[in-house]
Swiss-Prot record:
Na(+) binds at A166, C169, T172. It holds the Pfam family Proteasome. GO terms for cellular component: HslUV protease complex; proteasome core complex. It is found in: Cytoplasm. Keywords: Allosteric enzyme, Cytoplasm, Hydrolase, Metal-binding, Protease, Sodium, Threonine protease. One of its GO terms (biological process) is proteolysis involved in protein catabolic process. It comes from Afipia carboxidovorans (strain ATCC 49405 / DSM 1227 / KCTC 32145 / OM5) (Oligotropha carboxidovorans). This is ATP-dependent protease subunit HslV. Its EC number is 3.4.25.2. Protease subunit of a proteasome-like degradation complex believed to be a general protein degrading machinery.
């Protein structure tokens, strides 16, 4: 089994949808190294801080947990200010020699804002309340955008979009974890 940098990015799809006063983040459970499925029920979506922030990650698991811990520290430093906490984390991520090597991306959300954080220092907010990361991210994003105008609620859109991504992306499965917040 090989474990190269490119291979570590395969193995997940994380999607968030903000609709009808709710924000939902969902992720599949597959962890792959190369062409081998290592685990099918990993939990890549969770509540952060005091439960008022939800997040999901794609990339190297240990790196993502390190970033979640750093984000929780920033949330303690800047309570109720998710955007500020994320910008401060992104600054550290870009400038710290140790953090710069971490290979992960994150989607985080609170009742007001949804953000994608990348190792290049990007902190991005979607225009339409929908965004996705990971190997099946583009498939899930397209499906969610198509379903956003329907009568389906945010959780249904996330679940259905992740199922569609799992049907297309070999690094994504149907073991979905969902976290939600009501505005």
């Amino acid at each position: 089994m090989q474990n190269s940098q490119a291979e570590s990015w395969h193995g997940t799809t994380i999607l968030t949808v903000r609709k009808g006063g709710r924000v939902v983040i969902g992720g599949d459970g597959q962890v792959s190294i190369g062409q081998t499925v290592i685990k099918s029920n990993a939990r890549k979506v969770r509540k952060l801080g005091k439960g008022d922030v939800i997040g999901g990650f794609a990339g190297a698991t240990a790196d993502a947990f390190t970033l979640f811990e750093r984000l929780e520290a920033k949330l303690e430093q800047y309570p109720g200010q998710l955007t500020r906490a994320c910008v401060e984390l992104a600054k550290d991520w870009r400038t710290d020699r140790y953090l710069r090597r971490l290979e992960a991306m994150m989607i985080v959300a609170d009742k007001e804002v949804s953000l994608v954080l990348t190792g290049t220092g990007d902190v991005l907010e979607p225009e339409d309340g929908v965004m996705a990361i990971g190997s099946g991210g583009n498939y899930a994003l397209a499906a969610a955008r198509a379903l956003s105008d329907s009568e389906h609620d945010a959780e249904t859109i996330v679940r259905r979009s992740l199922e569609i991504a799992a049907d297309i992306c070999v690094y994504t499965n149907r073991n979905v974890t969902i976290e939600a917040l009501t505005a």
